[in-house]
Regions:
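Mg2+/Mn2+-dependent nuclease catalytic core
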Residues: 37-61
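Short, surface-exposed beta-edge/turn micro-motifs
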Residues: 28, 56, 63-67, 77-78
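Nuclease catalytic cores
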Residues: 4, 8-20
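Hydrophobic side chains in beta-strands
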Residues: 33, 69-70
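Short, flexible, glycine/charge-rich loop motifs used to bind or transfer phosphoryl groups or to couple energy/partner
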Residues: 19-22, 56-58
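Non-catalytic C-terminal interaction segments of nucleic acid-processing enzymes
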Residues: 1-7, 25, 54-55, 72-128
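Conserved catalytic cores of phosphodiester-cleaving nucleases, focusing on short active-site segments
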Residues: 22-39
Length: 128
């Protein structure tokens, strides 16, 4: 057991409660949920939508407090990327500006969306 158990426990309980509230909808926070099918496993990228059929959409217009991307493989959830929307927006913008994320890219159903291909590894490791 950590010698800082008495300090770590309240800290852990606080954030355990935050996640529990988000997952049980026992909060006034909104979560935007997107799902990536199998292709992410091959490419290592997720698609972040900015425009749909010529109209601003997705991360550009969301009012959600949290942005969730569910990663599925053969119909089974493999993981979930969950970030505060403001942090997701900032990270994606920086990755685009630095040429790490590809933008603009067509995607989504019928390639009706325009957005960014964002490398998952860089998204999760990126500081800034």
């Amino acid at each position: 057991m950590s010698k800082f158990y008495d300090i770590d426990l309240p800290f852990g309980i606080k954030y355990e409660g935050t996640l529990s509230e988000l997952l049980t909808a026992d909060t006034n926070k909104l979560i935007e949920v997107k799902t990536e099918r199998d292709k992410w496993k091959e490419t290592g990228n997720i698609f972040v939508e900015f425009v749909w059929r010529g109209t601003l959409s997705g991360i550009t217009t969301t009012k959600a407090d949290w942005w969730a991307t569910i990663l599925t493989l053969e119909g089974e959830i493999q993981g979930i990327i969950l970030l505060p929307t403001n942090i997701m927006k900032a990270k994606v913008k920086k990755l685009i500006n630095e040429g790490i994320a590809s933008y603009p890219v067509k995607g989504g159903d019928d390639n009706a969306s325009e957005g960014a291909l964002v490398p998952i590894k860089e998204l999760m490791n990126y500081e800034g």
